[in-house]
Amino acid sequence: MSEEVNRPEKEYSASSIQVLEGLEAVRKRPAMYIGDIGEKGLHHLVYEVVDNSIDEALAGYCTDIEVTINEDGSVSVRDNGRGIPTDYHEKEGRSALEVVLTVLHAGGKFDKGSYKVSGGLHGVGVSCVNALSTLLIAEVHRDGKIYRETFSKGVPTSKLEIVGECSDRGTTITFKPDGEIFTHTTEYKYEILSNRLRELAFLNKGIQLTITDKRVKDEQGGYLSETFHSKDGLKEFVQYLDATRGEPIIESIIYLDTEKNGVPVEVAMQYNDSFSENVHSY
């Protein structure tokens, strides 16, 4: 005998359908974009900004990336790439910089001529960081001028301004994560970020990555800081990983670097006498 289930009747009509504008969707469901809103998601914000700089390096336009944990808990990521474009975007009716920072799926990686390879969240990364930050400052050194624009929770709080002149080029993104989103913690851990940058240095040989923590000073009164640079890339990475995993059975590292159908493949491996295997893929 079936038993009738009494459910309170709720109206389900066109008025029930919500359309989230701009970056509202990111703030409404942040875990969909950065994985979670705990410690892992918090640090992922930094990874997304760094990945933009890595894209510039992979394209051959960037050699140095600096990550700074500031005294107020914000993070700055600076590179010496070409600088995010600041000219007027005809379709969007505003600067390209503002489009990149406020529109999902906006970026140079969708243009085949701008990037051959790229990382990050496929065009949503930096805009997500902006949406989940109480403050984001974008500073671009490009074409002899310094451009600056500020944002809060994904919304511009200033117009794009020229604040000076320069002889260098590059982009600096400074952001402070929103405590309303990251309710567990908004404090960055130096070890987590330094491990990530060390890994990126191995994966992208020739690029210099520096991390500085302005919250901590060493015995000499300077800030805690490390610089990572790898000449041999994956070969050095394998040596680093195997340093505490027993004696190598074969001294030389097996290494392959090739390309097929436009897809680059790089492999480095070494046999040692440890009990278990250790495989990393990217």
What function would you assign to each model-found segment?
Residues 25-28, 32, 55, 59, ...:
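Conserved helix-loop functional segments at active or binding sites
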Residues 40-63, 125-132:
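Conserved ATP-binding N-box helix of the HATPase_c
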Residues 2-15, 73-96, 107-232, 237:
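GHKL-type ATPase core
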Residues 212-282:
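GHKL/Bergerat-fold ATPase module in large chromosome/replication-associated machines
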Residues 42-51, 94-110, 194-195, 234-247:
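A short, contiguous, amphipathic alpha-helix enriched in charged residues
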Residues 63-69:
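A conserved short beta-strand within the histidine kinase catalytic ATPase domain
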Residues 1-50, 99:
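Bergerat-fold GHKL ATPase/HATPase_c domain
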Residues 19-27, 70-71, 164-174, 269-282:
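Flexible hinge/switch segments at interdomain interfaces of large molecular machines
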